């Protein structure tokens, strides 16, 4: 798949096997925010859930970000993949391809992030502020939620201490 994007909006990433993946993206912050009614958002939500439900590699997905709270420029989606899927092995490639497929189908900019190996603060934020879009495996979803919440709160002391130390508040 190829999409023509200005050079300043592209980046390269090495992937397994020495190949290079060209990551293209649109600066969504430059787009005008969409302000849809609750009913229009619900229709988009349901269409998106239907599209993701057909993908067996996706165990569960969350919508998070501005789409849930007001005007939005894109729809942010966090997905958790089966461990043996190619997307879990190459999350960056999977994100780019799925974003394009969903944008083509929905007509709305989509931002996809694979949660399997996402940084702890990011995963916690998605779970804390997001809404379940699809859940094909409730046990896997609940295990993930418990693991992220446990690790996040276990690490909170060290995160707070580090911040205080970085600001020079500890002696």
Regions found by a protein language model. Give the residues of each.
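Catalytic core of pol beta-like nucleotidyltransferases
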Residues: 2, 8-60, 68-71, 82-171
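Short, well-ordered beta-strand segments
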Residues: 76-78
């Amino acid at each position: 798949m190829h999409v023509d994007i200005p050079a300043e909006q592209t980046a390269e990433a090495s992937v397994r096997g020495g190949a290079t993946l060209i990551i293209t993206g649109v600066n969504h912050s430059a787009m005008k925010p969409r302000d849809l009614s609750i009913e229009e958002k619900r229709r988009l939500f349901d269409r998106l859930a239907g599209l993701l439900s057909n993908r067996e590699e996706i165990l569960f997905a969350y919508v998070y970000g501005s789409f849930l709270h007001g005007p939005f420029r894109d729809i942010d989606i966090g997905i958790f993949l089966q461990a043996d899927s190619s997307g879990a092995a190459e999350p960056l490639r999977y994100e780019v391809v799925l974003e394009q497929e969903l944008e083509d189908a929905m007509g709305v900019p989509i931002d996809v992030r694979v949660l399997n190996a996402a940084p702890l603060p990011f995963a916690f934020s998605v779970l804390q502020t997001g809404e379940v879009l699809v859940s094909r495996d409730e046990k896997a979803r609940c295990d993930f939620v418990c693991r992220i919440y446990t690790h996040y709160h276990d690490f909170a002391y060290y995160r707070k201490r580090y911040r205080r130390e970085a600001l020079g508040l500890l002696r």
